[in-house]
């Protein structure tokens, strides 16, 4: 796995069918601020399907701490790092989600790139150096690139 930090807008980078977007959300799927709000603006189905997705997550994915979706031919993996939108994630909750992401990726060899913001580091206030180390350790078996965007 190669991790590259890129200054620029996550959504300005060319997306291909072998890419996935990854970002953090709460299990209530509020998505009302930060990068989650930008995702919900770019993919309006997040808003219209919020109750359905939150219910589906609670029934099928809550142990995994991720919720993968396909919207407009775009693969998005939501890392569920906290229960409610006003909570803050911990390094432990992020680690659990990253481990689930690693399992998810091991079953999808067609994924060549992960496009993500500095997860957990905006409104959630985790330290990027620590998060970066967690990503590198947890996704070391991923045979592709992790592109992390910052402004």
Listing of model-derived features with the role each one plays in the protein:
Residues 1-151:
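Macrodomain-like recognition of ADP-ribose-binding/processing modules
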